[in-house]
Amino acid sequence: MKILVVLKQVPDSTTTIKIMPDGGGIERAGVKMVVNPFDEFAIEQGVRLKEKRADVESVTALIVGPAQAAEALRTALAVGADQGIHLKDETFDTLDELQQAALIALVVKDGGYDLILTGKQEIDLDSGQLGPALAELLDIPHVGATVGLEVAEDGTSFVARRRVEGAEEVVEITLPALVTGEKGLCEMRYPSLPNLMKAKKKPVHALTAGDVAGLAEATSGVGGMKLHGFEPPPERPPGKILDGEPEEAVKELVRLLREEAKAL
């Protein structure tokens, strides 16, 4: 069994984001970038399957992104993935998620992967399109928002548990298939220092647009999302401090809630 984990590098949710002057994106310089948290579940699930099952031949981690995205690949390798694929080219930066799915499908279609794992969504754009689109382009079944995964002993199918509106749905799927992970699937382990050092020696195959035959044809007419720009949220108005006696302050608070905040 060959497992592929598709990752994305995103800004750390605790960092301060700066938008480019032209509104075309975010400034990456000085911004802490991390593995998309939902993709962490996918990494850990792939590595756990490899540790548990003798029939897992390899776990490959794949990412689309600039040179900086190699850090996310190294994290996956330190956790336990065997090798990485880094799709990096300036032309890839302009692809929307559906076009990225078409790119990845071209690269992996002949890889013989039995199970493809990725996060159910990304925390920056939050669209969740890539996984389902990739499954469709590869013509394989897809299970989304998975919180439990158990592969059959013979390695031909698996049972997945997924969240659906306050309940859990249990489905059985024949491999090959694609699964998107949700919080609850498994928490990614912290890679140890020795494994971080070993990760530097694991192979990472970097591919540019020139290495992907048929890219223009595959992405032409695919996608439909046009990013018009990024804008910061409007500044919050300053808070008000109510002075005076408590009784008068309460009356003023009620008035403000009723007349200005329209909360009453």
Protein language model regions, located:
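N-terminal glycine-rich FAD/FM-binding segment characteristic of electron-transfer flavoproteins
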Residues: 1-264
